[in-house]
Amino acid sequence: MASKGPSYRIENIVATVNLGVELDLEKLAERLTMAEYNPDQFPGLILRLTKPRISALIFRTGKMVCTGAKNEEDLKNAVRALVKLLKDHGADVPFDPEVQIQNIVASGNLFAEVDLEQAVLMLENAMYEPEQFPGLIYRMSSPRVVILIFGSGKIVCTGAKSEKDVATAVQKLYNQLKDLGVLYIEEGEAEEGEEEL
C-alpha cells in the first residue's frame, strides 16, 4: 500500500453576521421559547439550532456570532434559518445579511511522524518549546493560518477564513515538511469524516 497524503476535518467555523438593524432582545426572548436571555449575565440572546447544530449569540446592535458549523454550507443554512426565525417572531431583518467567517479550526493527520527539533530550525515563523507545550507552533504567511504540529503527525489548523484555505495550508505544510526531510511517512488511512488531499 502506498503512503498517502494528509487529511483534515473541520471542527468549528466562527462567523459574524451583520443584520444591519437594531433588535429588541426582550421581545424576541419572550416570543422565542428556545432562546436564552439573561442580560444581567450576558448582553446577548443565545439561540441553539439542532440542524445544523449551531449556536448563535445575537446582540441588540443587530450583530450575530455563529459557532459550531462544520462546513460553509451548514453556516449558510444556519444563517438562513436564524433569519427566518427572527422574521417569524417580529424582527425586521434582511433576508440576505452580510456573513463574514472569522476563524475556521480544523484537525488533521499528516500520516507521518515529524521531527519537531529539526522542523523548528528549518521553518520560518516556527516556535517549539517542548517544556511549555508538546507541539510546534507554525505561523504560515499564505494562507495566513497558525498550525500546531505534533510529533505524531497530528495537526490543528486555526485562523483560516475559508475551507479552501484549510485545504491549501494542510497540503502546503505537508509538502514543506516532506521537502525539508523531517517527515517519517507511515502507512495509514484517513479517519472517518476527514477530507483526504
Swiss-Prot record:
Report the GO molecular function annotations. DNA binding; DNA-binding transcription factor activity
Origin superkingdom = Archaea
Entry keyword set: DNA-binding, Repeat, Transcription, Transcription regulation
Question: Could you tell me the Gene Ontology terms of the biological process aspect for this record?
Answer: DNA-templated transcription initiation
Q: Which Pfam families match?
A: TBP
Q: Where are the sequence repeats?
A: 10-86, 101-177
Q: Does the keyword Transcription regulation apply?
A: yes
Q: Which InterPro entries has this protein been placed in? A: TBP, TBP_archaea, TBP_CS, TBP_dom_sf
Q: Which HAMAP family match?
A: TATA_bind_prot_arch
Q: Family per UniProt?
A: Belongs to the TBP family.
Q: What does this protein do?
A: General factor that plays a role in the activation of archaeal genes transcribed by RNA polymerase. Binds specifically to the TATA box promoter element which lies close to the position of transcription initiation.
Q: What is this protein called?
A: TATA-box-binding protein
